[in-house]
């Protein structure tokens, strides 16, 4: 798959051939570690907390931010589908993140449980790489 992306306002276009795109194991592991951190951020976002762990958003604002963050995670994870399409942990992670969009504002315990589960799935993906499994 070839993607042409406009760069700036001058009409320049960057072309990337995704069929040739590959990360080495170290880069993939680092990317997955970042994903773990982004999954963990979901819970304080849902709770309306800032970086200092203080509640600064109303329940409604926090829920809106939670939905935006989930959209970001789903976009990021689904973008890696060519790399991970045969990995059971990846497939389950996508299902979980998409399913979390249906959670309501008052389902804190459910969000907390699934965030923990999602991070475990990503850790399992790292283990697959470290153990050279397919």
What annotation goes with each model-predicted range?
Residues 91-134:
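Amphipathic alpha-helical binding modules
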Residues 38-95:
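Amphipathic alpha-helical interaction modules
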Residues 27-30, 34, 88-91, 113:
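Residues within HEAT/ARM-like alpha-solenoid scaffolds
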Residues 2-63, 119-126:
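Short terminal alpha-helical segments
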Residues 28, 55-56, 62-65, 73, ...:
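Alpha-helix capping and helix-coil boundary motifs
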């Amino acid at each position: 798959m070839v993607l042409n992306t406009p760069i700036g306002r001058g009409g320049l276009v960057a072309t990337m051939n995704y069929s040739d795109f590959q990360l080495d194991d170290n880069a993939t592991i680092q990317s997955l570690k970042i994903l773990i951190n982004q999954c963990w951020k979901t819970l304080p976002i849902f709770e309306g907390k800032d970086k200092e762990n203080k509640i600064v958003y109303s329940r409604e604002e926090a829920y809106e931010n939670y939905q935006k963050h989930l959209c970001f995670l789903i976009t990021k994870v689904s973008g890696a589908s060519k790399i991970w399409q045969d990995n059971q942990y990846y497939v389950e992670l996508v299902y979980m993140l998409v399913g979390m969009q249906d959670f309501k504002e008052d389902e804190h315990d459910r969000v907390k449980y699934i965030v923990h589960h999602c991070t475990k799935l990503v850790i399992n993906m790292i283990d697959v790489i470290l153990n050279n499994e397919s």
